[in-house]
Amino acid sequence: MDSDYSFSLTTFSPSGKLVQIEHALQAAASGGSAIGIKAKNGVVLITEKKLHSLVDVTSVQKISMITENIGLVYAGMGPDSRVLIKKARKESEKYYKQYKEKIPVLQLVRELASIMQEFTQSGGVRPFGVSLLVAGFDEKGPHLYQVDPSGSYFAWKATAIGKNMVSSKTFLEKRYSDDLEIEDAIQTALITIKEGFETQLTEFNMELAIIGKNQEFKILTPAQIKDYLLNL
């Protein structure tokens, strides 16, 4: 059985799997839903924030700014995401000090993927139990990437991670258009995440962020999110 090989990070099971990576992928897949949509003029990130009723929702943040033109959202284990966010910011600072310009989105994605892949084959560590959606805008335009615990990364027009990723991707396939503007992408993201929501969608149980050509990466306030919800 594959489970007999889960004791080792670097031992393949008879079916050709690295079981610890499978566990990490499952941890990411069981996390809160997160969706990314690339529009003609920017990128939208949205995620649910499902917390215990006694938790102060303002103390939990799932979407993070890395640089002025790059941000990310995670699905999976929060503590693991904090490590990767710290490393992403450090790599961005190092790039700026060396080249005196902002790190390209793909360059940062490759750095993150390399770090995550290294944790699938090194002794004394385990894979990161998170998947990331990285959104950014650089001289080549808007970008949306997904990075998985295995170190794999993909460019997407629209995608989802977390517990409702299959149904969300199916929904996005029906609604996505290459002609989407950023405002349309926000509405599409809200409708998509609402489809998988078990309770009423409010400005307090979700996060929403945008990045555009002349717009720094911005995490919207609850009041701004409420305005969009009223127009659904």
Swiss-Prot record:
- Which InterPro entries does UniProt cross-reference here? Ntn_hydrolases_N (IPR029055), Proteasome_alpha (IPR050115), Proteasome_alpha-type (IPR023332), Proteasome_asu_N (IPR000426), Proteasome_sua/b (IPR001353)
**Intrachain disulfide bonds:** none
Quaternary structure?
The 26S proteasome consists of a 20S proteasome core and two 19S regulatory subunits. The 20S proteasome core is composed of 28 subunits that are arranged in four stacked rings, resulting in a barrel-shaped structure. The two end rings are each formed by seven alpha subunits, and the two central rings are each formed by seven beta subunits. The catalytic chamber with the active sites is on the inside of the barrel.
State the NCBIfam families in the record: PRK03996.1 (NF003075)
- Which PROSITE patterns does the record cross-reference, listed alphabetically? PROTEASOME_ALPHA_1, PROTEASOME_ALPHA_2
Gene Ontology CC, one term: nucleus
Q: Which family does it belong to?
A: Belongs to the peptidase T1A family.
Q: What is this protein called?
A: Proteasome subunit alpha type-2
Q: What is its main location?
A: cytoplasm
- In which domain of life is the source organism classified? Eukaryota
Q: Which UniProt keywords apply?
A: Cytoplasm, Nucleus, Proteasome
A biological process (GO) annotation for this entry? proteasome-mediated ubiquitin-dependent protein catabolic process
Q: Which SUPFAM superfamilies match?
A: N-terminal nucleophile aminohydrolases (Ntn hydrolases)
Name of the encoding gene:
psmA2
Cell compartments where the protein resides: Cytoplasm; Nucleus
Gene3D superfamilies from the xrefs? Glutamine Phosphoribosylpyrophosphate, subunit 1, domain 1
Any idea what job this protein has? The proteasome is a multicatalytic proteinase complex which is characterized by its ability to cleave peptides with Arg, Phe, Tyr, Leu, and Glu adjacent to the leaving group at neutral or slightly basic pH. The proteasome has an ATP-dependent proteolytic activity.
